[in-house]
Amino acid sequence: MGQTVTTPLSLTLQHWGDVQRIASNQSVDVKKRRWVTFCSAEWPTFNVGWPQDGTFNLGVISQVKSRVFCPGPHGHPDQVPYIVTWEALAYDPPPWVKPFVSPKPPPLPTAPVLPPGPSAQPPSRSALYPALTLSIKSKPPKPQVLPDSGGPLIDLLTEDPPPYGVQPSSSARENNEEEAATTSEVSPPSPMVSRLRGRRDPPAADSTTSQAFPLRMGGDGQLQYWPFSSSDLYNWKNNNPSFSEDPGKLTALIESVLITHQPTWDDCQQLLGTLLTGEEKQRVLLEAGKAVRGNDGRPTQLPNEVNAAFPLERPDWDYTTTEGRNHLVLYRQLLLAGLQNAGRSPTNLAKVKGITQGPNESPSAFLERLKEAYRRYTPYDPEDPGQETNVSMSFIWQSAPDIGRKLERLEDLKSKTLGDLVREAEKIFNKRETPEEREERIRREIEEKEERRRAEDEQRERERDRRRHREMSKLLATVVIGQRQDRQGGERRRPQLDKDQCAYCKEKGHWAKDCPKKPRGPRGPRPQTSLLTLGDXGGQGQEPPPEPRITLKVGGQPVTFLVDTGAQHSVLTQNPGPLSDKSAWVQGATGGKRYRWTTDRKVHLATGKVTHSFLHVPDCPYPLLGRDLLTKLKAQIHFEGSGAQVVGPMGQPLQVLTLNIENKYRLHETSKEPDVPLGSTWLSDFPQAWAETGGMGLAVRQAPLIIPLKATSTPVSIKQYPMSQEARLGIKPHIQRLLDQGILVPCQSPWNTPLLPVKKPGTNDYRPVQDLREVNKRVEDIHPTVPNPYNLLSGLPPSHQWYTVLDLKDAFFCLRLHPTSQPLFAFEWRDPEMGISGQLTWTRLPQGFKNSPTLFDEALHRDLADFRIQHPDLILLQYVDDLLLAATSEQDCQRGTRALLQTLGNLGYRASAKKAQICQKQVKYLGYLLKEGQRWLTEARKETVMGQPTPKTPRQLREFLGTAGFCRLWIPGFAEMAAPLYPLTKTGTLFNWGPDQQKAYQEIKQALLTAPALGLPDLTKPFELFVDEKQGYAKGVLTQKLGPWRRPVAYLSKKLDPVAAGWPPCLRMVAAIAVLTKDAGKLTMGQPLVILAPHAVEALVKQPPDRWLSNARMTHYQAMLLDTDRVQFGPVVALNPATLLPLPEKEAPHDCLEILAETHGTRPDLTDQPIPDADYTWYTDGSSFLQEGQRRAGAAVTTETEVIWARALPAGTSAQRAELIALTQALKMAEGKKLNVYTDSRYAFATAHVHGEIYRRRGLLTSEGREIKNKNEILALLKALFLPKRLSIIHCPGHQKGNSAEARGNRMADQAAREAAMKAVLETSTLLIEDSTPYTPPHFHYTETDLKRLRELGATYNQTKGYWVLQGKPVMPDQSVFELLDSLHRLTHPSPQKMKALLDREESPYYMLNRDRTIQYVTETCTACAQVNASKAKIGAGVRVRGHRPGTHWEVDFTEVKPGLYGYKYLLVFVDTFSGWVEAFPTKRETAKVVTKKLLEDIFPRFGMPQVLGSDNGPAFASQVSQSVADLLGIDWKLHCAYRPQSSGQVERMNRTIKETLTKLTLASGTRDWVLLLPLALYRARNTPGPHGLTPYEILYGAPPPLVNFHDPEMSKLTNSPSLQAHLQALQAVQQEVWKPLAAAYQDQLDQPVIPHPFRVGDAVWVRRHQTKNLEPRWKGPYTVLLTTPTALKVDGISAWIHAAHVKAATTPPAGTAWKVQRSQNPLKIRLTRGAP
């Protein structure tokens, strides 16, 4: 238990600081959270073997790196810094990584060389691969085709063309005729091929063996190695689709390469690695291994045979032999077989169906795409006649909609071939209407539709007018007839009642309210609401439809449908929610119209319950139940005398359920049975008590609540926060329900608070929560009377073991709010569908109001008071809305539960039937599990604590301690266990989670898992409290007798306050008993308590030592512990540390009073009475007073007549501090003597006698836990108390006027202290108190070097005093000078000049030997100064390397141009270092993709491929994409030093020139379009003379740019272009007269000596931090120099080169220096110093 496994990921997290430092050295930045995410979740998905816990295997890291750096959309550029840092950790592991890194394998040779083998026999010829053999004789060296790069340039006109290849000599053919016959067919490579392949010197080995392989026949018949060039691989990769997209094409390419190039095993791996991904390569190798056949010709699975034919590791085949070449031929054949098998993708008809014809795509082009999809995603050949039908059907179905519909209507479609279908489709495609025709047709249709609509509206208006006339006529006729009947028959009214006649029984003598015949008693229960059918109308303001009708639940709302067998589809008239895009044409009596369908919510149920998609017809008079839904229901309609009845197929009533699609899963869920199912009788017998049957509750006996405001309160109005559509729709049903129930009403109020939608965990449901914090601040506070759950269960006796738990539903809503208080809780709500736009407020007590729990708890308690009186044998506990009823038997519990439910129903409260626990012996209440008179922690409570992750912040730690603290009664010693965690919760404390915190965290969780069962407190029995104390922590267990055993009731623990923690053990036990007795009182409820402890503390409490306890604390302890009616002390017992219960054997008791008497003082013989035979009797005093606004202080030690010691103290010293200093000085001067010392300071006297020892035990802390004042002086006094042989410190009154010895001595000491305070302060240190004896210099030790130097300076030696004297001062030796100056420098780290000025200003009594040299050495070797101080290093100017001809050496850089225009914000600048020619391209992004695109599309076609590129370390240049492209093209990309723009000086200066020119042009032209003005800026840059007087244009083209006057009439003469020969002659002249002299001049600059920097290999240097944070040193290191150049350094630990101007030398102390130990002011600390040599 407690052990953890260290993984690479956890190791890096433990050393995260080192990881960040290594990442910074790699010029990247990493974050811990993303580090963990990539390692544990992202990289394992690459399927390259990366484990979730990380690895330091370089092979796996390189595979992950290749995936991360993959170009295009498959790459992961955001993961580049993290994998680069992983690789740096594994490649150059720090000490904490080395044990986890496997040793590196020996490096493989970069160029494989064949060992000399035996002479090969003439091989047999192969039909596929021609056999090539080695020549026996050596051939002469081949003539050089291309000139040397360092030689002179080629004369393009005079030089002869390069020679062609030389044919093999005749002697070679004579020596081996067969070989000659074989090789005659293979011609030597052409010069162009040689140029593309690269120049290589001929092998220097013996001509009988081949030093390079694979297998290219040279001119002399010898096999030579011609590897794949980077351009070949690049072209194959980019000009062909990937293997996953088109495996056939890539397989054909590889097959042709294998035949024509005859690659070796290594070249095959290189080819596969370039053209295939890692997964594709593995699949090919696996399929190739399956194709290996055994001796019987069948595929074999024997590993030895498979590895022999198709090895996965590099084999040792000798290609000079026939056997080796045969192995290679077989390997290529198997590789081709693997490619073909791996390329067979599985059948995926979904991909084929996804190929559809485009809007403007021709049918023939679509057919070709369809066939290609068949070839790629299916094993079928679309050209096969057997597949023509499938292809034809796909062509018809996936064609454009208009073409497909017409093709489906073709006659005799089965007999049509695919060609016929394509021809028909072409005809349809060509006859499509043009866009103009289509617009004209749509316009005509719209006009016709509008015309029909107007005619229908006019007809409808005429019909409406005629109907109104007929109805008015009928109404008038009815009125006339009614008047006639009235006149004939008179009025028919209810007979008038007499004054004393009852309206109910019509008898006289009483009224209706007093009628005895009228039924009395409570109103009967309301009829139970049907969950599926309602008899209401179908909508607001709408009469119910005629019979037959059925009421269904649609979207949570009841809707009454008219059963209409004539309707084909069921219809809804109200808005049913979201509608689908589908619509249908509905033809009715009044005409036809198109209506939309509701969203598809169909769910078929075997029970007859269905959901349905309805047609939304707002114009329909009634919702209709059509034939579609009646058919699915298998409904039966019976016509009887009472009317039509609609029932199911078995005669049962129909039940139709409509719900949203997201709730469909609930239909398939199995109902979760409760622990004890609530019987239906409880629901039916008490319908008014349950929320499920009684509706919303209302407390009928409670008056509306008035919420009083504070006197200074003003209305607060906070706008509603933005709310998402999902959240608004989620809380909308709740708002609607509360509006319907009258709990919410519209209002207008100056108060407004926001509504917050809170998502319920695990569901998509939201509930509205109102933010009432501002309202709570303005409402008067009331005293909370909610019970404390800590001691609530103390009122539950263990004898009551039958329980009922009820949870009131929407309890706060049962209390009404007074209308005057309702505006306080208003909030905004808008619902256009309901017509609500404004404020709503609560008519009931809202949730979130701070006084709601107290108000409801008091109201319910008052309402249930009668129930408690009527049932005294039952126990009813109430915590707000949670009720617990306990009884002794099941019958009493059922009887009491029935009475409680009846009472709740009558009072208007509603309980939740889902959460009810009725008459059970085991229930859950307030997070506890109650059973058989005991309580446990519930599993949910334990899982809550166990499920919390390791805290990372103080807030998370506080949450954990709060959750675990709820369970502290079950954890013995919880306070001591959690002690390491509490300091991290303080504000402003650094959160440092260490091993101690982790151990405490795990111990709390482990203790929670083993939490015991605690008995419920029985208030009829006495309690016993066992108490123990250890290291300032009180621990105890509260028990009660259960037969012969003690049953734990609670485990108590608490930390003592700092004052009590500093007491002796016996007094700490008193404090522990007092603390735990107070906590136990919350559970015992004032019952008798017996305290048992290992100390006899009762005597201590009755007679406490006044020196340790204050009067207030003493009174508090006595009042609590000496209450004999409630607290009694038992016998002294020895406790078990684990259980805190008594042990069988007892230890010998001790007397606490004796122990306190022995430990109350600091020195046992210290007394306050004069010693008769004292050697000295001294008087001490300290003085502190204000004079001229400055506080002066002094201290003195005197006798009655003379001053022994007096000293002025620093300004601001207090009188108490001065008294301590004086008393301490007296004790030091009386070392080894008998001393009587008098002081008039109560503070110094009490510190020496009493408080000093208390402070020492308490850790020098006050009672509030703060550090005491005068800490150093008190420590010095406590130390000096033991110096005299015998000591008596006596207190005497101050400022006495008598003539006694005490009075004279005190006055003398007071006068001496005041006089000393008036003098100048010589020393500021108050702890280095000097002796009263005269000053004598210390004894110096001079070395031989010191003596030699002293003799040279003319110093004299003082024989009497034993030291050398120079200039009248004692000479301090070199070593002592170093120690003094080193201590002085470390105080404030001044500069050498400041130290010299300080020493010159202060007159030193010594002559310091070699002072200036030592000061310089101390400041140079100070590590803090070296890391912070700036450096003034001056480095000489270097020489920039330039190209030897145009286009070979470029510098590139990005520069930002503001303001951006058309999205162009950056300018990519290329500068040719030879000519100064500049190319600039405006770009929108500063990325590596832009750099490579411009390089390949602009620079390369115009100037050729560069040999060298220089740039800074920007992300676009240092990225893997740019560097990989440069490596592939053979470009040497030089990254300049970081933060050194001078390294890219040419391109940086060009950036400035371009931007300055653009600024001038924009000002002159008045336009901001710098992109338009860029060519003019480039023209100026290209035609500005350089340092040699030539412009870049002249250097490149050999002549100035042509300047043409377009107004010159002779301009036509200038348009004649010179011939090609003239151009070449001019180019030759440029080469001879310009390029060669410039190249020579640049070379001369390189040959000139450059003053290098002073750093050498092996030096230690500090490296500058270019980005420093607050309080972070300016320099980092020191680092060791590994490599140097004239201007840069390479140091150990940083990958990039560093410019010499960014480092400074680190002075390290010599190895011969010795360490010395020095004392410090703190007696618990020492100082280690190292002196100068």
Curated annotation (Swiss-Prot):
Residues 449-464, 484-497 have a biased composition (Basic and acidic residues). This is Gag-Pol polyprotein. InterPro entries: Aspartic_peptidase_AS (IPR001969), DNA/RNA_pol_sf (IPR043502), G_retro_matrix (IPR000840), G_retro_matrix_sf (IPR036946), Gag-pol_Znf-H3C2 (IPR039464), Gag_p12 (IPR002079), Gag_P30 (IPR003036), Integrase_cat-core (IPR001584). A motif (PTAP/PSAP motif) lies at residues 109-112. RNA binds at residues 721, 771, 773, 787, 851, 853, 1054-1055, 1082, 1184, 1186, 1242, 1266. DNA binds at residues 941, 955, 958, 966, 1063, 1113, 1187, 1214, 1216. Residues 1442-1600 form the Integrase catalytic domain. Mg(2+) 1 binds at residues 807, 881-882. The gene is gag-pol. Keywords: Aspartyl protease, Capsid protein, Coiled coil, DNA integration, DNA recombination, DNA-binding, DNA-directed DNA polymerase, Endonuclease, Host cell membrane, Host membrane, Hydrolase, Lipoprotein, Magnesium, Manganese, Membrane, Metal-binding, Multifunctional enzyme, Myristate, Nuclease, Nucleotidyltransferase, Phosphoprotein, Protease, RNA suppression of termination, RNA-binding, RNA-directed DNA polymerase, Transferase, Ubl conjugation, Viral genome integration, Viral matrix protein, Viral nucleoprotein, Virion, Virus entry into host cell, Zinc, Zinc-finger. The active site is at 564 (protease). Residues 139-218, 449-497, 511-549 are annotated as: Disordered. A lipid is attached at residue 2 (N-myristoyl glycine). Residues 559-629 form the Peptidase A2 domain. A motif (PPXY motif) lies at residues 161-164. Mg(2+) 2 binds at residues 1181, 1310. GO terms for cellular component: host cell plasma membrane; membrane; viral nucleocapsid. GO terms for biological process: DNA integration; DNA recombination; establishment of integrated proviral latency; proteolysis; symbiont entry into host cell; viral genome integration into host DNA; virion assembly. Residues 526-535 have a biased composition (Low complexity). Mg(2+) 3 binds at residues 1181, 1219, 1240. The keyword Magnesium applies. SMART domains: ZnF_C2HC (SM00343). Pfam families: Gag_MA, Gag_p12, Gag_p30, MLVIN_C, RNase_H, RT_RNaseH_2, rve, RVP. It comes from the Viruses. Residues 1172-1318 form the RNase H type-1 domain. The record marks 129-130, 213-214, 476-477, 532-533, 657-658, 1328-1329 as: Cleavage. GO terms for molecular function: aspartic-type endopeptidase activity; DNA binding; DNA-directed DNA polymerase activity; RNA binding; RNA-directed DNA polymerase activity; RNA-DNA hybrid ribonuclease activity; structural constituent of virion; zinc ion binding.
